[in-house]
């Protein structure tokens, strides 16, 4: 056999070996991905803030932020669209609104870092669109859609809820017309908002302020309008600092009552 023929045969075997290794690697990567795919679970509800979380076994570790301050950097928020989390259409009529203020809520449920925001949003919408009995026995009517306009996940990801063109819903005694409703996942009576959540809240609030000409003194919480503990003490006590940072960033010249 000539030297050229031997060289060609060696190259052929080398190519076959390389493709075999590549295929083997891809196969094991795919198998690994499939084995790590989470199982779908049922949804449940029973919370004062009218938020449903997906029922699943999760790591008990709470990713709580220990910072007492927001960082001083700003960027436009990245918002997961309704289409991206596969939202259903609203099931009824909703009240059109002109956005005048920002109102902050918490879900009043334990943070669930192992569940994707897409699944949480689908669960929230399922719960919102049916009548239910809430914690304490209070009845909730079926709403047309998710009650909040924006949902901030434990990792800081933001999802679009109800279209901000329409007023949100509440199970407490106040009129949410004109409010851009932002909810952060967690029970902030016992947990702390994560650093990522606080950064996303700040960026989202600034973006809304610019878009709708909202002043910093129009950024308040659920408990400022209704008899409720929402958004929990561990978030509520951070709001004065949030307003100041946003006011400074917007270049407001009045103190706005702070």
Summary of predicted features, one role per range:
Residues 96-139:
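Active-site acidic/histidine clusters and adjacent loop/turn architecture
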Residues 131, 139-146, 154:
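Glycine-/small-residue-enriched capping loops at alpha/beta junctions
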Residues 2-103, 107, 111, 142, ...:
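Basic/polar, cationic surfaces and motifs that engage anionic cell-wall
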């Amino acid at each position: 056999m000539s030297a050229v023929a031997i060289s060609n045969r060696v190259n052929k075997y080398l190519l076959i070996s390389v493709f075999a290794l590549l295929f083997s690697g891809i196969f094991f990567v795919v198998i690994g991905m499939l084995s790590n795919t989470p199982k779908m679970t049922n949804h449940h509800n029973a919370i004062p803030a009218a938020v449903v979380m997906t029922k699943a076994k999760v790591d008990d570790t709470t990713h709580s932020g220990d910072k007492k301050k927001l960082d001083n950097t700003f960027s436009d928020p990245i918002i997961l669209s309704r289409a991206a989390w596969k939202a259903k259409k609203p099931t009824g009529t909703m009240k059109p609104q002109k956005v005048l203020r920002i109102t902050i809520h918490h879900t009043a449920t334990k943070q669930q870092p192992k569940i994707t925001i897409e699944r949480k949003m689908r669960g929230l919408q399922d719960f919102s669109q049916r009548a239910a009995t809430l914690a304490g026995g209070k009845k909730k009517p079926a709403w047309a859609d998710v009650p909040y306009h924006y949902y901030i996940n434990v990792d800081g990801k933001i999802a679009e809820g109800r279209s901000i063109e329409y007023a949100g819903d509440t199970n407490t005694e106040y009129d949410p017309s004109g409010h851009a409703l932002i909810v952060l996942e967690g029970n902030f009576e016992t947990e702390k908002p994560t650093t990522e959540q606080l950064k996303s809240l700040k960026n989202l609030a600034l973006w809304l302020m610019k878009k709708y000409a909202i002043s910093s003194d129009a950024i308040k919480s659920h408990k400022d309008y209704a008899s409720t503990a929402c958004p929990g003490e561990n978030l509520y006590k951070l709001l004065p600092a949030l307003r100041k940072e946003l006011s400074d960033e917007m270049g407001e010249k009045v103190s706005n009552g702070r």
